[in-house]
C-alpha cells in the first residue's frame, strides 16, 4: 500500500474544496497529494455542503483514506493524505467563510453538481428566486449556497486585504468558469457594487 511521501504535520492548507464527494477524493485530492511531496502549501480543507456524514469518517481518520486503482493488471491501494481539514458548511458557515478568506488559501475548488449553483441552466443567470439565494441575500453573514459562500469569502478577503483568489469550478457545466464568475459577480452586485468591482480585479475563475 503506497503511503504519503511527506510529513503530514508540515502540511498547510492552501486549497478549500466545496463538495467533498467521491469524485474529488479520487481526482483533485490525489493531484494535490502528488504535489505535496514537493510543496507542503497545498493541503486541502474539504467541505461537505449537505451532510455531516460525508466528512465524519474522514475526521475520525485524520483526513486519511484509501484509494483503490483498478486496471487490467490488478488492483493497487494508495493512502491519500492531502485532506488535512474537514468542515460541514451548514454547521458553521461563518467559520468556513473565514477559512476561505485566510491569506494562506489561494484556491477554492468546487464539485457541487449543477443544482448547487442556483442558476437557470438555460440562461446561465443566477436564480434570484431560489430559496438559498434569497436566504443568502437576507443573511449574507450566514450563507448556505456555494455562490453566497464564495461572495462572502471574497468580501472578507477584500475587507482584510487577504489578496486575490483562484476559483475553480470542477463540475460538468459548459463554460463553467465563465458561468460561475457571472453568478458570483451578479450576486455581489446585488449586495454592493464595491464588492463586484473588487471581484473583477482580484478573483480568477
Task: Give short role names for the model-derived ranges.
Residues 1-205:
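Non-transmembrane, aqueous-exposed alpha-helical and coiled segments at domain scale
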